């Protein structure tokens, strides 16, 4: 099942810089692992925002939630999930 996921990162101002840099490095590694596994299909930065739009290919809502909650920056994200369905006019 495909999902469009928007992730807006909202890091509190009182987070130590070194801790935040470690979180970003861990986040990058986790995101790349999921991309290599074929789960995180697409990843785009949203211009002008600390945010991204991504496409995930997972079994169901529970699997998606489980994966998103493993992201190191998850506690600092506002996440919007949109399940996707095949469009009848799409050319494959």
Predicted features and spans:
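Conserved, structured core segments of small domains
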Residues: 1-92
